[in-house]
């Protein structure tokens, strides 16, 4: 089931106008450093992106009021359009549009002040705790820690950890409905003993969502009654075979608004301005990725590659999962990527001679000056090498969260009864139809083919995969807008935000460099059949404009698979884009020679084949 946005839908009576009569929509995203306003307008019956305004976020001292940054960003929109939006008395926006001024709908997302920071507790690490973790991540939270009976820590260590972390909220799950409740009560008692205090001040009770065994709800309520703001919802795992994260996710969103946001500087005021509840930025981004899956009825893998974090989203057969790698990013967390991946894994993507120490010092400089952008081709290529590793690690982490339910198998031996082996993730690249990327490095790449290859190198798509990215950062804005007016959000997304980069046709399997890998026959728009013979180790671009579709017949060699099994032919409708069709015969997993000279030569061959960078400066660099 797709992540429901019903809990954000508001009674249409609270809107100043019906959605069909709306002319102007304003959406903002209050980020940790920048507040980004996006102004949308219905022109000739079609919703389009009109203009953007940005200003520094004002959550920190001396301002300590987010609405100042919002007003500054909206003022920029006013200056660029001449359209008056703000009330002169500073009481928010003019609502609705009256034919001359104002806006019909205002909504916002926010990640300022650290976003939503949660702690999760469950009974068994690989079962209820894992399901609770998925629910918290799906609600747009950063999960600080997962506490479970079998997490290997002593009770006093858990108490210390809960006390030290100061989360915004806690999610407690455990036990199936009607099962024994003793162990869940033990975890609840640990939480009570720790006396955790909320991050944004001790003036209010820490919100706790209880989504465990419903037969002990009363006992939980009695235990927590004076110290915490308790909300009980349906069990996340009512029976082992079923996961029900939606009620917990809905409660987390509501409490985020009610408790967390209302204590952040200026948010009380901002909440009075908006027509819909404020949504955590990653939840908005996730909803935008779901718009793609929902509209095209496909499996989607999406990524938000940020400066400090990498968010990965998957919608496979309607099941939405989000993961956040809070320590993988392209500016603030860039040295963390180096630490996690290892410098040698970054070096393997660089096609020119450079010392490891030199790369390491460049990345450390980037960390202490996070807002700098690459000034030379050399800088850009080093940054692209890091991006590949951040994306690879982000997906690796995502796969540990997007797993089949554990504890469901019936046939077990006594020895593995309580030992849940990590099961394979259901995110398999051959089943992914669309890859979508957002984030500065991907959105602002000098050439559109660059994100196409970076995402391909990092995630290794197989078979036929469409590649999209955003042109202007507004996925969170469109995600939150879609909760009120889905058709308007999709119209803007489709026409002004979603860039069709092209389609990747990639064969899975390995072979010897130069051996036959696959033959691709493309029936081009003019009716001619273009036949491409691809040898192992080759990669090639076939131009096909955005909006054009061609029939492709792919015949892989007997050890290669393009979706129908090794050596079996596949027919597909292939869609064009700014870069075109990328025929990838480099194999899966990707092979890079151990020998540095051979590796650099092979990388150079791929980069020149795709015209990834300007030819002469690249030739000069790899000499």
Language-model-derived ranges and their functions:
Residues 352-382:
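A mobile "lid/hinge" subdomain adjacent to the ATP/sugar-phosphate binding pocket shared
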Residues 31-33, 112-115, 306:
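Short flexible coil/turn linkers enriched for glycine and charged/polar residues
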Residues 318, 330, 334, 352, ...:
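Short, well-ordered loop/turn and helix-capping segments at boundaries between secondary-structure elements
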Residues 32-35, 310, 441, 445:
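Conserved protein kinase catalytic core
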Residues 29-41:
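N-terminal-proximal low-complexity accessory segments that begin disordered
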Residues 304-307, 314-316, 332, 395, ...:
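Active-site proximal loops enriched in glycine and acidic residues that flank catalytic Cys/His/Asp
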Residues 2-27, 41-48, 54-299, 379-388, ...:
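Nucleotide/phosphate-binding catalytic cleft detector across ATP-hydrolyzing
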Residues 39-58, 287-361, 446-469:
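Glycine-rich phosphate-binding loop of actin/hexokinase-like ATP-binding domains
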């Amino acid at each position: 089931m797709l992540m429901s946005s019903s809990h954000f839908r508001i009674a249409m009576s609270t809107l100043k106008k019906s959605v069909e009569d709306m002319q102007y929509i304003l959406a903002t995203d209050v980020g940790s450093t920048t507040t980004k306003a996006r102004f949308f307008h219905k022109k000739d019956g079609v919703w389009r992106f009109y203009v953007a305004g940005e200003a520094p976020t004002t959550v920190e001292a001396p301002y300590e009021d987010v609405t100042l940054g919002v007003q500054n960003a909206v003022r920029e929109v006013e200056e660029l359009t001449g359209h008056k939006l703000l009330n002169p008395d500073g009481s928010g926006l003019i609502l609705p549009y009256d034919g001359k001024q104002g806006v019909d709908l205002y909504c916002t997302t926010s990640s300022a002040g650290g976003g939503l920071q949660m702690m999760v507790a469950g009974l068994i690490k690989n079962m209820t705790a894992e399901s609770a973790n998925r629910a918290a991540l799906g609600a747009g939270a950063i999960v600080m820690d997962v506490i479970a009976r079998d997490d290997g820590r002593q009770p006093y260590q858990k108490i210390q950890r809960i006390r030290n972390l100061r989360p915004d909220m806690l999610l407690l799950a455990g036990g199936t409905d009607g099962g024994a409740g003793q162990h869940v009560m033990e975890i609840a008692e640990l939480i009570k003993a720790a006396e955790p205090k909320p991050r944004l001040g001790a003036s209010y009770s820490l919100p706790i969502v209880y989504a465990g065994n419903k037969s002990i709800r009363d006992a939980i309520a009695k235990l927590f009654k004076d110290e915490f703001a308790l909300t009980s919802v349906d069990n996340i795992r009512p029976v082992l075979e079923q996961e029900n994260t939606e009620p917990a996710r809905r409660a987390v969103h509501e409490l985020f608004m009610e408790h967390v946001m209302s204590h952040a500087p200026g948010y009380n005021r901002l909440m009075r301005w908006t027509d819909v509840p404020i949504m955590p930025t990653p939840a908005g981004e996730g909803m935008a990725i779901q718009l793609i899956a929902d509209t095209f009825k496909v499996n989607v893998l999406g990524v938000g590659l940020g400066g400090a974090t990498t968010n990965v989203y998957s919608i496979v057969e309607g099941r939405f999962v989000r993961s956040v790698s809070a320590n993988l990013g392209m500016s603030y967390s860039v040295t963390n990527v180096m630490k996690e991946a290892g410098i040698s894994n970054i070096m393997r993507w660089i096609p020119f001679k450079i010392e490891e120490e030199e790369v390491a010092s460049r990345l450390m400089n980037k960390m202490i000056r996070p807002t700098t952008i690459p000034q030379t081709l050399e800088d850009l290529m080093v940054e692209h090498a890091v991006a590949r590793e951040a994306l690879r690690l982000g997906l690796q982490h995502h796969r540990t969260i997007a797993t089949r339910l554990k504890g469901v198998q019936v046939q077990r031996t006594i020895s593995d009864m309580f030992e849940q082996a990590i099961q394979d993730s259901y995110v398999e690249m051959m089943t992914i139809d669309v890859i979508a990327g957002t984030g500065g490095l991907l959105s602002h790449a000098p050439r559109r083919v660059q994100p196409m290859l970076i995402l391909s190198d990092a995630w290794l798509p197989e078979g036929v995969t469409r590649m999209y990215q955003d042109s202007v950062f507004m996925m969170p804005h469109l995600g939150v807008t879609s909760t009120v007016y889905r058709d308007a959000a999709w119209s803007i997304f489709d026409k002004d935000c979603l860039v069709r980069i092209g389609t990747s046709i990639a064969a899975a399997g390995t072979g010897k460099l130069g051996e036959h890998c696959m033959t691709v026959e493309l029936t081009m728009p003019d009716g001619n059949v273009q036949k491409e013979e691809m040898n192992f180790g080759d990669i090639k671009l076939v131009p096909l404009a955005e909006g054009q579709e061609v029939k492709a017949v792919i015949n892989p060699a007997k050890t290669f698979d393009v979706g129908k099994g090794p050596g079996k032919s596949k027919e597909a409708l292939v869609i064009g884009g700014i870069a075109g069709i990328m025929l990838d015969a480099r194999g899966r997993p990707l092979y890079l020679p151990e020998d540095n000279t051979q590796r650099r030569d092979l990388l150079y061959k791929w980069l020149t084949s795709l015209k990834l960078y300007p030819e002469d400066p690249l030739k000069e660099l790899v000499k």
